[in-house]
């Protein structure tokens, strides 16, 4: 038997489990290790200002100051999601019939980039090898992903080589720094994308920081104003409540937690090796790719006639249901990576010990084996 993963129903099931956990045991019972938990730390005084015009008037200057400190550049543009910023950027800067070229450490790119390229009638090419990377005369935008969805980081040298090639062709460079604005800088001590020479940088205010799901874009005043026009035309701007949450997240952000997780990850990794598991390390924890989860389940005796993305999602769903541990495959947006990633920098990691996490990881593999043997996939994923 084989099934195709229904992304909408899968996410609805994951969120229902979370809702039931909150109603039964409270929100503090959840252990969100996605690195995307975010936060919305606003005060009664903030709430009194959350009106259509009063809010932007009061908070604009503050988000500009904090955003520039975090990302660099001359001007900041808050948007309702990083994806929104990418969409607006491409609509504003890319003409039909031209090309977007993209360099990243490992494919695939965030789907919003190729999808919007198609939307505006532009060609799109991805490169992971700098020796093959090329910018022809028809290129209107160069993208760089600073840190991939699985937290793989490109070097400063590669950054500079791509930017140099783009500048030689007089092509605008945009950096998708969704989590990279924290990982690259806190762990690898890299400069901001703007300081490296990029024209635009966009980051997610919920990734490895305690802000709400939203996006912050930085760049020159001229370029940001051009993109801002599109953002306002399409209703992609961050409203006052979101901007306040972003400000609080930026104020609370400190690289120390990320740096501490980076130091501890090797101890955590060794505990997993001691259990005969072989995850991949990330800068702030560890992860199992979907194929690795399938292989581990098969190693434990299950005969798996099912695609790896389904197995990984089952594993993620069982983690929530049995251990209250949230990972991306069960609850991420449609199209999100099915890598099961455990972020030890997440604030909820304080709720359990390393040994408790390792025990949950191992037991969930056994539970996934039972699902495979009993052919309970649809029940776990959707019912």
From Swiss-Prot:
Give any single GO term for biological process: transsulfuration
Checking InterPro entries in the record gives: Cys/Met-Metab_PyrdxlP-dep_enz, PyrdxlP-dep_transferase_arc, PyrdxlP-dep_Trfase, PyrdxlP-dep_Trfase_major, UPF0425_MJ0158-like_C
Pfam families, A to Z:
Cys_Met_Meta_PP, UPF0425_C
The Swiss-Prot or TrEMBL record lists the needed cofactor(s) as:
pyridoxal 5'-phosphate
- Does the record bear Transit peptide in its keywords? no
Sites of N6-(pyridoxal phosphate)lysine modification: 207
What GO MF terms are annotated? L-seryl-tRNA(Sec) selenium transferase activity; pyridoxal phosphate binding
User: Mind listing the UniProt keywords for this protein, alphabetically?
Assistant: Pyridoxal phosphate
What highest taxon heads this organism's lineage?
Archaea
Which protein family is named in the record? Answer: Belongs to the UPF0425 family.
Protein name listed in UniProt: UPF0425 pyridoxal phosphate-dependent protein Msp_0916
